[in-house]
Each structure stands twice: as structure tokens, then as C-alpha cells.
Amino acid sequence: MGAVTISVVALESADRIELPGGSWSRMLVTQDRVGGNASSLGYSVFKPGSATTSVSHEVEEVAYVVSGSGRLDTGDGEVRFRGGDALHIPSGTWHAVVNDSDSDVVMVFGFPHPDYPPTERR
């Protein structure tokens, strides 16, 4: 068996991606950062009262809500979530993250794609 390379990526080392309402995201595991990966991982903080643009990814998305509560607005209504919940968003599903609470929502998310996947926005 060949040598295994394990990558460690510090949150602060990834570029901050600004989102609406003071929210932000960082892509931690990507092809540029670790290379040879088949999946990607990111970290987001959604500020109280914020809402993202509605997006649809070419691949499924999974997420874990570390803390806070809010909802996903989808084409079929809304889905509530809170800290400790895991989310599975099928590919092609339109969704927006809405923090309708008075505290931050912290979420870790991933895709079966080596980078942030091709995405439509509306």
C-alpha cells in the first residue's frame, strides 16, 4: 500500500465568501486546496434575518446544522431545521437558506464533487 496523504485545512486559511445579510461561507476541501479529492466540504455562518439567493446544484448536497435554527425555502414549501439536524438536498432542488431566528446558524455542507459544483441561481 502506498503512502497516504492526509490534508488538514484550517478554517481561517480558506477564502471568505460573502453572502447576503452579513453571512459568509468558506470552501475548505476543494481540488485547489487538497487535490485528488472526489468530494468537497464547506462551512457557513448565516446571520439572523438573512436569506441566501435560491440555488440549484447539479449534484446532491448534504449538510449538518452545528447550531442555530432556520429554514430552507424550496419550490415545494419550507423545511425547518435546527442544531443537530442533518440535511439531504437532492440534485436539481431549488433552495434558499433563511435564518429567521435571533442567533447565528452554523452549517457544515458537502458535495460529491471536487469543488463547489455547477450551480444555477435565481
Residue ranges and their predicted role:
Residues 41-44, 88, 103-120:
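A short hydrophobic beta-strand segment most commonly corresponding to one strand
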Residues 76-92:
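Short acidic-glycine-tyrosine-enriched beta hairpin
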Residues 34, 102-103:
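Short strand-connecting beta-turns/loops that link adjacent beta-strands
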Residues 58-70, 75:
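Glycine- and acidic-residue-biased ligand/ion/polar-headgroup-sensing regions
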Residues 58, 77, 93-94, 103:
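A generic "binding-loop/recognition-motif" signal
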Residues 52-54, 72-73, 89, 95-101:
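Short beta-strand His + acidic residue motifs that chelate non-heme Fe in jelly-roll/DSBH
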